[in-house]
């Protein structure tokens, strides 16, 4: 029998061609429909984007700064955390020591120096404590020449090494609550020595350092039995033999806070009202002074009005902590001497403030300084009231705090949420 291999039949010329054409036509139609749908989707997406852009009705993220024409908030609003550390003590931590109306200044090696203030017995202090941030221990150093409270303090650095050479302590009030213009240097190795006296009263004023000079600003001056906030500014250089009067602040400020950052001087908050109307007296303004031109510029205000706060310079920003605020009674009247938990960070390049984690213990009239570990706050007064009259908030004696808290903030991307300026968050 003859063997023939199997041969695959050829497709019919008619049937195979029709199928091929039908498949090609169907593929082309599907491709065209896909193209049309894709083009429509792109068109609609662009139209939606343009409409949303025009209406600014949606938030979006940017890196580094808020887009021009928009308002914004840090994606890390409320960042940071506060932690209790060793309370203020004069005997190695055995007994806590409440104190208010003091100043804290960072020395070399990160240690913080606490000057003067008022204790729980109402005594105005000449005390100097050194806080070791590593061992968390307080050491009693040589006292100041004179007791003082509600004064200014700032560091002068060495022109050759950049290290703290001396700390200037100036102004404030004495043991009788009288305004004083005396000043002294505090050498970290040898203790105090006389410094040139101020030209003006600066009770409850604020001091900032640029390293090569310190600036004493604002505060109160006494006229008879009345006190008036002042706008005076004085400068003492590292080699100066007298305070030099500089351009006044844009407006008077008592109970202000100040810090030096990258060669500029900043003054935040404070109080100014001749009638002591607390509904308008507390301020949230921020003023920047340029030593190179002897001029002041008003910058973006804080989000919260307050006085007797602290302003601390970080690496590139400023941290405004705590302070005294107005508070309404049930009948609608306002009182002061009420401490706040507010914490805000200022970004000079953006001219913008952002909320940070609130401090655990509300306080005002406290000391604050930055170390290598974080931002420290020491002592201060809480919400004050007369124990015999719950509606009288003018009584603070004996309520001074020994509390010491430290603020830590992890580094994070500089991400900002942008939104329509008409919507406030």
Role assignments for model-derived ranges:
Residues 1-15:
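Intrinsically disordered cytoplasmic terminal tails of membrane proteins
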Residues 13-48:
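Single-pass membrane-anchoring alpha-helices
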Residues 38-425:
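Kelch-like beta-propeller repeat domains
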